A protein has these predicted regions:
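Short amphipathic alpha-helical interface segments
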Residues: 2-32, 80
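Short amphipathic alpha-helical interaction segments
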Residues: 3, 32-49, 62
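Non-catalytic, well-ordered alpha-helical scaffold segments
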Residues: 6-10, 40, 69
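Small side chains
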Residues: 16, 42-43, 65, 71
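Short, amphipathic alpha-helical interaction segments positioned at domain boundaries
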Residues: 63-81
Length: 81
């Protein structure tokens, strides 16, 4: 069972919320200011919960699309609790 930190999830969701429809954002721990392990755990958790309109994994690198309705709801929930 994945147990990501709330702040790591908020960081990824906030970054993805800035994307336009159809674009993908490569997840880079250095760019996001997260530890690699924390970023991977949070990304897996959020992808499993359908928080992005799409995602892609190629050669161990993950990219995510804009937020789905579920992602917007989760960001709101995490940011306000």
């Amino acid at each position: 069972m994945l147990n990501p930190s709330k702040s790591d999830c908020i960081t990824i969701l906030t970054a993805a919320s800035q994307l336009s429809d159809g674009s993908l954002m490569p997840l880079d721990s250095r760019t996001l200011g997260l530890s690699r392990n924390g970023m991977e755990t949070a990304a897996s958790f959020l992808i499993e919960r359908a928080c992005f309109t799409r995602h892609r994994e190629v050669n161990g690198h993950t990219a995510v699309g804009s937020l789905s309705l579920q992602g917007r709801m989760r960001l709101d929930q995490l940011a306000n609790n």
